[in-house]
Amino acid sequence: MTQWVFQPEPHTALVVAQSEALFPVRRVYCVGRNYAEHAKEMGHSGREAPFFFTKPANSLVQILENREGIIQYPPRTKNLHHELELVVALGSGGSNLSLEQATEAIWGYAIGIDLTRRDLQSAAKEKGRPWDVAKGFDQAAPIGLLYPRSQTGLLEKGPLFLDVNGIRKQQGDLTQMIWSAAECIAELSTYFELKAGDLLMTGTPAGVGALEPGDHVLGSIEGLGQLSFRIDA
């Protein structure tokens, strides 16, 4: 009789807002430099084709509404950065999707924070190495409740902001994305067969910056509530 060598971890899932449902997470894709002003602050300009990287599904940390989560300051870094992002959850998938098909694949949305060990990322860039240790560490992706598209409609505009200790650090609008969520999904589907349960973090506006132990972080996107957490030593 076949049996596990050891008991596997529970499947990563997100809580669906205003319900008892759970959304099973398959993969977490991320879009780089998808807001022009953020691209500039990172030393780039122009409308380049979207590029992608990934985070492990088990790097997600579910943050419930009206509760402050706790994120441990990660090891091997002295420059941990916050990046506020709209997260898109897919309810269907496929390969080589048209823009219309990509739009129809969107199941819902959440607030996400792409935490980044910026010093390790910079060192990797200089050496032409992958970003995994900078982007895929434990607790690297705090994420809020998942709101079904049936409730929110398509999110293509609306303000988003991030505060650290009550001070506004990031502010923008979803209309400022260089590539829309659907355009990113369509492009991503030319590289991978997308499936239900995939998440896409769609990029961050300008104003990324360092976090220190003890900092309180609050992220908000219109229609998706708020996400808050504290950085623990």
What positions do the PLM features span?
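Catalytic-pocket segment enriched in acidic/His residues
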Residues: T2-F23, H38, H44-G46, L64-E65, ...
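Extended, compositionally biased flexible segments
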Residues: T2-Q101
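A generic structural signal for short beta-strands and their flanking turns/coil linkers
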Residues: R27, R47-A49, P56, H82-L86, ...
